[in-house]
Each structure stands twice: as structure tokens, then as C-alpha cells.
């Protein structure tokens, strides 16, 4: 039985993010790194998350917070709605919605993540949370208003 990749690519996990999480390959661009990091949250792989955070973030120092975050969170889906190159080819941005249920309540992370290419490897470095009006179209692509979708 084949398992679809949690990242939402509609590919089998073995043909998608598994190669990055196993360390067989590096994610070739920010979009693939974003998808593989989302998958790491779904399958609770703190080591991969720490390895793909930029070293300046010192993610290993908050390993316990990462692991404890796995306990009550069930990830429901990822929608990438924009990718862009930064001021140089060594910087990229991915805007996304990651839906989850935590303590039986639905939620969403809406972020514009920044990635840096260093030493041939892409790293997550930081992100900003865009603000949406309650009556804006939801960025997840559902066609609903933000207040009736991810903004609940």
C-alpha cells in the first residue's frame, strides 16, 4: 500500500519528501524545503527540523519545545500560495497556510517564510505573519472569506 506525502504534493511519500528527511538528498529550493519541513512536523521528526533551521537560529537549544509541540497538534494540510526569489538568488520566500487541530480546536499558521542558501543547502531562517482583514479572500485558496476559513 502506498502512502501519499503529507506535504500535499499528491506524490507518494517515497517519491517526494522522504528523500530529504532521510538525508539522501538536500531540498533543491525553498518550496521543497518548506514542504519537507511541513512533513517533518506531521511525522514528528525534530532532527530534520533542527537540521534545516539556519545555524544562527540555534534550533537545537529549543529541541524540547519542538518535541512537546508534537503532542497535541494534528496537522491537517499545507497550501503554498506564493513563492519568490529574494534580493539575491541565495534568498527565497514561501508564503503558505498550514492547517492544524490543537486541543480539539482548528487553527492555521499563515506565514511568509524566508530561506537562505548557504554551503549548497537551503535553510529556514525566519518568517513574517501577514495580516488579513476578516473579509479578505482566504489565502488557502478555498474561495471563502478569511473569517469563515483559516481566520476562525
UniProtKB/Swiss-Prot annotation:
InterPro entries for this protein: NTF2-like_dom_sf, SEC_C_motif, UPF0225, YchJ-like_M
Top-level taxon of origin: Bacteria
Family matches, as HAMAP family: UPF0225 (MF_00612)
UniProt similarity note: Belongs to the UPF0225 family.
Protein name: UPF0225 protein Ent638_2310
Amino acid at each position: 500500500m502506498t502512502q501519499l506525502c503529507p506535504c500535499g504534493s499528491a506524490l507518494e511519500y517515497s517519491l517526494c519528501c522522504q528523500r530529504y528527511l532521510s538525508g539522501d538528498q538536500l531540498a533543491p529550493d525553498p518550496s521543497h524545503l518548506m514542504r519537507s519541513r511541513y512533513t517533518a512536523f506531521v511525522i514528528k521528526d525534530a532532527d530534520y527540523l533542527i537540521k534545516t533551521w539556519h545555524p544562527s537560529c540555534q534550533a537545537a537549544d529549543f529541541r524540547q519545545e519542538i518535541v512537546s509541540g508534537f503532542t497535541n497538534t494534528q496537522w491537517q494540510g499545507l497550501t503554498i500560495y506564493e513563492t519568490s526569489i529574494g534580493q539575491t538568488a541565495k534568498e527565497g520566500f514561501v508564503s503558505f497556510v498550514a492547517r492544524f487541530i490543537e486541543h480539539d480546536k482548528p487553527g492555521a499558521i499563515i506565514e511568509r517564510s524566508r530561506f537562505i542558501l548557504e554551503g549548497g543547502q537551503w535553510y529556514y531562517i525566519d518568517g513574517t505573519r501577514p495580516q488579513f482583514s476578516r473579509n479578505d479572500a482566504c489565502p488557502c485558496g478555498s474561495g471563502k472569506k478569511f473569517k469563515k476559513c483559516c481566520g476562525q
